[in-house]
C-alpha cells in the first residue's frame, strides 16, 4: 500500500557574506514540521532541524576550494525507531573544489563524510537492546556547461 509522508511545512533561512571578493561564508537553518505529517513515523518525538555552515575561496581565476559542516537533529523517540524506519542524528563534514576551464566550463568535485550517533532501543527480547547506527561517505563530480 501507499504510505504518506508529507511535510506540512518547512522553514528555511540562509545567508551568504563575502568577507573579501574571493572568500565567501554561508550559513543556513532548516526546520521541518515532520512530526505532524500524515503517515509520519514520528509519534512521540519532536520535529527535525538542520544547521549548515560553509565557506568558499577562489584561490585564483581557475581554482576554487570549499568546506562545510551540517548538523542534522532528528526528533525520533525510542518508540519511533524500528528496523524499517530510523534516522540517526548526524554531523557531516564536506570538502570540495572546482576548476574553471573557461567562462563556459567548470569541473566540480566534492567529498562528504557523515558522523552518526548511536541510538539504543529496548529490544523485543527481555534485557536486550537494539543499536541503530550507520556510516556514510559520498563523492560527487559534476561538469557545468553554460550556453
What kind of feature is each model-predicted range?
Residues 1-147:
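Outer-membrane beta-barrel porins/channels
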